Structure formats: C-alpha cells, structure tokens
Amino acid sequence: MSSIASSLSKHNTTPTEPGNSGGKTVMIDPGHGGSAPGNSSGGMIEKDYNLNTSLATTEYLRSKGFNVIMTRDTDKTLSLGNRTALSNSLKPDLFTSIHYNGSTNKQGHGVEVFYKLKDKNGGTTKTVATNILNRILEKFKLTNRGIKTRVLPSDSTKDYLYVLRSNDMPAVLVECAFLDNENDMSLINSSAKVKEMGTQIGKGIEDSLK
C-alpha cells in the first residue's frame, strides 16, 4: 500500500472552505484513520485505502468545479462525532463516507452503498447511492450488493450507521469492496486502480448533483 500512498500523495488535498468555487459543496469522509485502522488483510489496511480513494474522489470533483471539504486528508484519528459535527456545521450539499468492507469468514465480496432511511421510498441519498454504485460497476467487475438502508436493532426508525443517523445533511456510505477478499482486491491492486475507484465515486456524485 505504501506505493499506492506515495503515488497519490501529489494530489491536492488541502480542504477548501465552502463558497470558494461557486459550485456545490461535497464533504468527503475517508473512514477510520490514525489509531482506528479499520479492516486489514495481508498488510492492506483499510484506513489507507479509504484515504487514497477519497483523495482521488476529491481530485476528480475539484476538477469539475465542485467545492470539496475532506474530514481528514492525513492519517489522523477522527471520531464519528467530529465527522458529523463538521458536516452539520459546514452544511455541504452531500456527505460521502468512503470505506472498504470486511467479513469474519473472508467470504464476503462485492460493492454496496448505504443511504438514509428517510429516503427509502425515494430521495436525494437513494439517488446518490444508485449513481455511485452504477459508476463503480461500470469499471469494476465486483459483485453488486446493491444500495441499502440499515436500522438500529433497538429502533427501526433510525439509521444504524452513525455518520448517516447523526448527520443533518444528505449522506451516504460507500463500501467499495471487501479488503479481505482476494478476488475483490485483485481488481484494485494498484495505485491506478485505487484512483479509478475514487474517480468513479466522484462521477456518481457528479451525476447526482450536476
């Protein structure tokens, strides 16, 4: 992963404040970071893939005139509460959290996108989730796990995922692939492929907000 990180380090990652570009604002949230590595397998660490995929998404969106704010642009620890507080404070048009999945038996595979429960019958986040998923599948032969909502076991009226549940803004969470699945990661095994994944996520966002 170090080669992927070094090849992507040249990306412009300075967070931009809202309003500078004159376009819509997107908040990109690379999952985990710092002392929270996320999933890992064979030396691959989720937090690194999340960040580098997010850098590519940011680069693409900025090239298209979007104003992009990253919750983190380095390998630092950031709580879920801080991520959503930043979103609720800066009020982007869309919050997108980027992750790589994992499974206990290493049998999980494919790509999926979670969106807000309130949009289950149609709405912004369902549209965004659909567009991101379609764009990823356009370039990667991953299993289509679909777009999904997930509810709290204790309250079926609330989103399970904190960054969706506690976020006042439209928000989705992308699980790009299973980090512990050899077939999945064989499709994303170079800096170019990581960049392509991030670009496809960016295209899905662009499709939704243009």
List the model feature ranges, each with a label.
Residues 1-25:
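Non-catalytic propeptide/linker segments at domain boundaries
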Residues 37-52:
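Glycine- and acidic-residue-enriched helix-capping/strand-helix junction motifs
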Residues 31:
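Extracellular repeat turn/loop positions enriched in glycine and acidic/polar residues, especially those
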Residues 15-18, 49-210:
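Active-site-proximal helix/loop segments of hydrolytic enzymes
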Residues 36-38, 182-183:
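A short acidic, helix-capping loop that chelates divalent metal ions and anchors anionic groups
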